[in-house]
Amino acid sequence: MDAEPDGSALAEDLRAAVAAHLEAVGALDAEAVAAGFAADAVFSTDDDQAVGQREVYTLFRDAFADAATVDLELARMVVAGDTAACELTERIRWRSGATLELRLAAFYTVSGGLITRVRVYRFLPG
């Protein structure tokens, strides 16, 4: 993982929040995912939007329902202020055996060690 050389406390909070999020997703743990978000946080993709911890929990619980494994590999993170821009690869294997690999760009905003906003852009294969 490459990271911009910003040693500030906020940058460290950002890196820690992103790392915890990726770990919780990899563990298919919707409760741990939601715990990393502020009470009024917003998580959005082109297809979904969740506002608040409860909706974040529900979104991830439903997303994990048919997943056997999810791996989010962080290739690069650039920190600017309270936001981290991340390049990721998402690998999903469903219980059916089907697999999917996507490239992602995700922007995380953090305050007080909690994620307040995530915007994910997926680059579909083909």
Q: Which residue stretches match the model-derived regions?
A:
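Short, low-complexity N-terminal intrinsically disordered segments enriched in polar/charged residues
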Residues: 1-36
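A solvent-exposed, acidic/Ser-Thr-rich amphipathic alpha-helical stretch
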Residues: 30-81
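Short, surface-exposed coil-to-beta transition loops
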Residues: 71-73, 100-106
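A short hydrophobic beta-strand element
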Residues: 81-90
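Hydrophobic beta-strand positions in extracellular immunoglobulin-like domains
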Residues: 90-92, 110
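Short, cysteine-centered beta-strand-loop-beta hairpins and adjacent loop/turn segments enriched
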Residues: 92-101
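Short beta-strand edge/turn micro-motifs at domain boundaries
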Residues: 103-126
